[in-house]
């Protein structure tokens, strides 16, 4: 009888190996994150009512250097004629996109450092919103301190990696119409990312797998694109705004700095860098001249003043609440901030800005013609009261740019597209100008951060740019007119519901969810197979036990293992999987809208809703011209 039984040492070894395999498989399953791991279940200070559907956390983009980008995603509240995702980036370089999320286009605004309120002009009405802190080291993102990026193509490569891994987690969004939006130095980031996406889409493997990303448009406000035209716009802008009188003693210092910049740009002979130290002195001279009794002009809104030398760094007023809120332990826990993030959130990272000084990258203005000709629509908008990235410089570089057989806003040789007056709810709002895939919008009486000043107008601009049409949905369209014409119906502040489009989206989400379950189930299957094999082995031994009285005596080490132990273990695994699936379903598959329960007026029915410390980086890398730090006379293009 003993010849039919495995030797005692083999039995012991099998048990140990089974244990090791189960532990390893369990660890792999636990470490492979899914969408449910990023689901935001509560948000401190949230307004009354159910929470918005959102996900947040880190995604690794550079394993070697521990590079992780932070994202915060808000699901759209309603679906109009098609599904869209807008990715928002702030600038700096090194300034957090939480500025955009909490002070501009996100669904929440801060009342104080512990209370949130709804933003009635939030961009998540008809589009999914994805905010990303990048490059690594910015905001909640992090990396080893010696691995910050230097060039725009490096940044774009990181971002494409981020998107690949984000879509693996959220496959239901991969085939959305994709738009990028942002402001200031994002005028450099976004065109480079767009080019990297178009290059990726040419990859044969991507084409074969039908994983093309449907990049439709770029929407950039008060962007930094072309140093030549934009540096040289400072002097004419201050003259136009009456900030300095021509030929005055105050003007002479600014004019000297302007002349030095012209000479430096001439010496570059077409090889102009994105950042030119000599030309930065023009803005510094303007701020110095404006200094009166310790107060200077706000470079982001020339109607305002600030203490010298901050000159706008303390603006907007919501900023004083932002850092205290985002450093709270309960907030970082809610947003799934990794423990590897050792320091508190800062608006702009001096170390990132000091490192990110592109020497090889050409200005993004050189990329725009190719993007336009490829079919990507581009919208540029300016707040008329911004100095640092003012509208004169933007308009000048547009007028010189050539693409699709024309120059600037030419409709035909010598015939330019007209500037069309825009009114919003009966008030003059600005003007539109369009030609050959490019749209330009000037917002009257607006600052560097247009959505902060006019959230609902900015959302109206977004809906027009995205081509949102609520004709088949219902709701009360906003009274927004260009040259007196209303155009496509869009809605701001009233939240209609989709029927057919919503049903199609539910089917899409259901298919994507089964795909996600299958993917995560591959790892779980390993655990089940191993457990089943172990159960079969012990079942065989139990039968031998019943057939021969010497079985238990020969293998006393197995006496404590009952027939129900492995099933109980497997059931514990299954219960955790069911809980994760329920969380995934709660975050991804809840009904988007409820027609019966909708109340009139603005609704939120689709809501399913650290202490700061000076780092060694900040000591070694003091704030520079591009950094937005209190108490510095810097020129941060946030």
Curated annotation (Swiss-Prot):
Entry's EC annotation: 3.4.16.6
This protein's UniProt keywords: Apoptosis, Carboxypeptidase, Glycoprotein, Golgi apparatus, Hydrolase, Membrane, Protease, Signal, Transmembrane, Transmembrane helix
Protein localization: Golgi apparatus, trans-Golgi network membrane
Protein's membrane topology: Single-pass type I membrane protein
Domain of life assignment: Eukaryota
Lumenal side: 33-519
Coiled coil: none
Descriptive protein name: Pheromone-processing carboxypeptidase KEX1
Function: Protease with a carboxypeptidase B-like function involved in the C-terminal processing of the lysine and arginine residues from protein precursors. Promotes cell fusion and is involved in the programmed cell death.
UniProt lineage: Eukaryota, Fungi, Dikarya, Ascomycota, Pezizomycotina
Basic and acidic residues bias (residue ranges): 590-599, 617-630
Keyword Glycoprotein attributed: yes
Family: Belongs to the peptidase S10 family.
Region annotation Disordered: where it falls in the sequence: 586-638
One MF term in the entry's GO annotations: serine-type carboxypeptidase activity
Example of a GO cellular component annotation carried by this entry: trans-Golgi network
Keyword Transmembrane attributed: yes
């Amino acid at each position: 009888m003993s010849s039919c039984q495995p030797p005692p040492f083999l039995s012991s070894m099998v048990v140990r190996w089974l244990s090791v395999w189960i532990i390893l498989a369990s660890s792999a399953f636990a470490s492979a994150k899914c969408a449910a791991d990023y689901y935001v279940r509560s948000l401190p200070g949230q307004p009354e009512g159910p929470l918005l559907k959102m996900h947040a956390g880190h995604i690794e983009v550079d394993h070697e250097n521990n590079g992780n980008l932070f994202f915060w995603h808000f699901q759209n509240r309603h679906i109009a004629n098609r599904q869209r995702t807008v990715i928002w980036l702030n600038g700096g370089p090194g300034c957090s996109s939480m500025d955009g999320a909490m002070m501009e286009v996100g669904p929440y605004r801060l009342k104080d450092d512990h209370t949130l309120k709804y933003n009635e002009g939030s961009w998540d009405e008809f589009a999914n919103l994805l905010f990303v802190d990048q490059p690594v080291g910015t905001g909640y993102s992090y990396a080893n301190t010696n691995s910050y990026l230097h060039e725009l193509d490096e940044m774009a490569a990181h971002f494409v990696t981020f998107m690949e891994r984000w879509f693996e987690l959220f496959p239901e969004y991969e085939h959305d119409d994709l738009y990028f939006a942002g402001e200031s130095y994002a005028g450099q980031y976004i065109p480079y990312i767009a080019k990297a996406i178009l290059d990726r889409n040419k990859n044969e493997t991507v084409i074969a797998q039908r994983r093309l990303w449907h990049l439709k448009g770029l929407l950039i406000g008060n962007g930094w694109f072309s140093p030549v035209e934009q540096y040289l716009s400072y002097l004419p802008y201050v003259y136009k705004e009456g900030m300095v009188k021509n030929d005055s003693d105050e003007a002479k210092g600014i004019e000297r700095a302007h002349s030095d910049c012209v000479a430096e740009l001439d010496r570059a002979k077409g090889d102009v860098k994105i950042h030119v130290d000599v030309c930065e002195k023009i803005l510094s001279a303007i701020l110095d001249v404006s200094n009166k009794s310790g107060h200077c002009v706000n470079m982001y809104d020339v109607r305002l003043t600030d203490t010298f030398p901050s000159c706008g760094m303390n603006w907007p007023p919501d900023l004083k609440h932002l850092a205290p809120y985002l450093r709270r332990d309960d907030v970082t826990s809610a947003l799934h901030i990794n423990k590897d993030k050792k320091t508190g959130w800062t608006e702009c990272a001096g170390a990132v800005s000091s490192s990110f000084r592109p020497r090889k990258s050409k200005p993004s203005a050189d990329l725009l013609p190719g993007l336009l000709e490829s079919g990507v629509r581009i919208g540029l908008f300016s707040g008329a009261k911004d100095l640092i990235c003012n509208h004169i410089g933007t308009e000048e570089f547009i007028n010189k740019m050539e693409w699709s057989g024309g120059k600037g806003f030419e409709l035909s040789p010598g015939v330019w597209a007209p500037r069309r007056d825009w009114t919003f709810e009966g008030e003059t709002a600005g003007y539109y100008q369009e030609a050959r895939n490019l749209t330009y919008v000037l917002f009257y009486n607006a600052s560097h951060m247009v959505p902060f000043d006019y959230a609902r107008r900015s959302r109206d601009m977004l809906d027009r740019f995205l081509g949102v049409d609520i004709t088949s949905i219902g709701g009360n369209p906003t009274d927004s007119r260009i040259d007196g014409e209303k155009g496509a119906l869009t809605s701001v502040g009233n939240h209609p519901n989709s029927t057919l489009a919503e049903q199609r989206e539910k089917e899409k989400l259901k298919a994507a969810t089964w795909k996600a379950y299958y993917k995560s189930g591959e790892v779980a299957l390993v655990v089940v197979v191993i457990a089943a094999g172990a159960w079969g082995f012990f079942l065989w031994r139990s039968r031998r036990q019943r057939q021969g009285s010497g079985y238990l005596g020969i293998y006393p080490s197995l006496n404590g293992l009952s027939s129900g132990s492995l099933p109980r273990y497997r059931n514990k695994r299954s219960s955790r999987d069911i809980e994760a699936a329920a969380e995934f379903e709660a975050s991804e598959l809840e009904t988007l809208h409820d027609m019966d329960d909708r109340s009139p007026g603005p609704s939120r029915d689709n809501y399913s809703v650290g202490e700061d410390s000076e780092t060694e980086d900040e000591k070694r890398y003091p704030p520079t011209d591009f950094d937005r730090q209190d108490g510095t006379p810097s020129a941060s293009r946030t």
